[in-house]
UniProtKB/Swiss-Prot annotation:
ATP binds at K46, G53, R54, G55, E99, A102, E107. Keywords: ATP-binding, Ligase, Magnesium, Metal-binding, Nucleotide-binding, Tricarboxylic acid cycle. This is Succinate--CoA ligase [ADP-forming] subunit beta. Succinyl-CoA synthetase functions in the citric acid cycle (TCA), coupling the hydrolysis of succinyl-CoA to the synthesis of either ATP or GTP and thus represents the only step of substrate-level phosphorylation in the TCA. The beta subunit provides nucleotide specificity of the enzyme and binds the substrate succinate, while the binding sites for coenzyme A and phosphate are found in the alpha subunit. Its cofactor is Mg(2+). One of its GO terms (biological process) is succinyl-CoA metabolic process.
């Protein structure tokens, strides 16, 4: 689960992590009022959406007087902001964050995330802040520190010293940053985050460090332990189809291909997507119907994937274990009663009650179903139907 910058910064403040003063605004008048209340002569007017790259997309502006605050707020609020993370469809800006200015002398990058390959928590830091970290990693890898932390040991001084060394900080600056990272690490662990990112982390003329931006992503499976975090969910920022699928116990992620996938189990779903790509076609989604799929949930899955007008073929790949194949077959029939299916369906069913499922489909009146003998054959059929 992702949250907005203003929400992340409120959490930072509660945990003693330095941020600049700021207030959320839901209207132009409120934006101007917030700037007046914050005081000063420079403010940042920031679009609040669940995506990075806001500045390049025109969603972050620096105002040097209240008239500029009003002007920028009126332009950003209600705009459809397109960034490299939103996709071409963009995101509607429904709220702003008005933040006090600062005398910035240097920008850094800092993130804490879980490195699955290394089975460690990893701190990533760079002296090149305010930029695309992937570009920095490609062009100037020597400017990036990657410090692994064993969760059983936790964050220690030597971890912080390595970060300070790569960032080129002096002794006093290093002490300040290490203290800040220690608080961030504790917050990351305490709140079951997947990722905590500050880009940029700024150093002021006074030598102090502040989180100028804040991005936090939380483990959905751990939200039951953090009701105060779950309350921060902004469903307007989520894909409607993905949100609806979750309500029915389906794991759905929309992609940009033309082959819709319906699979049971995340591992098999990823393998299915891989073999579709290998065949030369492109998956339109990730869809795991889970272990408790019923005819009703399968019908709902059909309904959701058929809303994607790019879909040319549906590939159903089920290995019956907990999920019986006959349930999937009945779900297909149920779906076709309520939703008109005019595109080919490739079905590969194996495992529990696979023979019964084949009989159900053979006895149906569905003319556009093609049976696959195995996964490879299914991918080949899909590719031939996509063209």
């Amino acid at each position: 689960m992702n949250i907005h910058e203003y929400q992340a910064k409120a959490i930072f403040v509660d945990n003693g992590i330095p941020t600049l003063k700021g207030k959320v605004a839901f209207s132009v008048d409120e934006a101007v009022a917030n700037a007046k209340e914050l005081g000063g002569s420079v403010w940042a007017v920031k679009a609040q959406i669940h995506a990075g790259g806001r500045g390049l997309g025109g969603g972050v502006k620096i105002a040097k007087n209240l008239d500029e605050v009003k002007d920028y707020a009126s332009k950003i609020l209600g705009m459809n902001l397109v960034t490299h993370q939103t996709g071409p469809e963009g995101k509607l800006v429904q709220k702003l964050y008005i933040e006090s200015g600062a005398n910035i002398v240097k920008e850094y990058y800092l993130a804490i995330l879980f490195n699955r390959m290394a089975e460690q928590i990893t701190i990533i830091a760079s002296s090149e802040g305010g930029m695309d970290i992937e570009k920095v990693a490609k062009e100037s890898p020597e400017k990036i520190a990657k410090v692994g932390i064993d969760p059983q040991i936790g964050f220690k001084m030597f971890h912080g010293l390595e970060v300070a060394r790569v960032l080129g900080l002096d002794k006093d600056e290093g002490k300040k940053l290490i203290s800040m990272i220690a608080k961030l690490y504790k917050l990351y662990m305490d709140k079951d985050m997947n990722m905590l990112e500050i880009n940029p982390l700024i150093k002021t003329a006074e030598g102090d460090f502040y989180a100028l931006d804040a991005k936090c992503s939380f483990d959905d499976s751990a939200l039951y332990r953090h009701p105060e975090i779950a309350e921060l969910r902004d469903t307007t920022e989520e894909n409607p189809a993905e949100r609806e699928a979750a309500e029915f116990g389906l794991s759905y992620v929309k992609l940009d291909g033309d082959v819709a996938c319906m699979v049971n189990g995340a591992g098999l779903a990823m393998a299915t997507m891989d073999i579709i790509n290998y065949s030369g076609a492109k998956p339109a989604n990730f869809l795991d119907v889970g272990g408790g799929a019923s005819p009703e949930t399968v019908a709902k899955a059909f309904e959701i994937i058929l809303r994607d007008k790019n879909v040319k073929v549906i590939f159903i790949n089920i290995f019956g274990g907990i999920v019986r194949c006959d349930r999937i077959a009945n779900g297909i029939l149920e779906a076709t009663k309520n939703v008109e299916v005019n595109i080919p369906i490739v079905v590969r069913l194996d495992g529990t009650n696979a023979a019964e499922a084949k009989t159900i489909l053979d006895n149906s009146n569905l003319k556009n179903i093609k049976a696959a003998t195995n996964l490879k054959n299914g991918a080949e059929l899909v590719k031939s139907l996509v063209g």
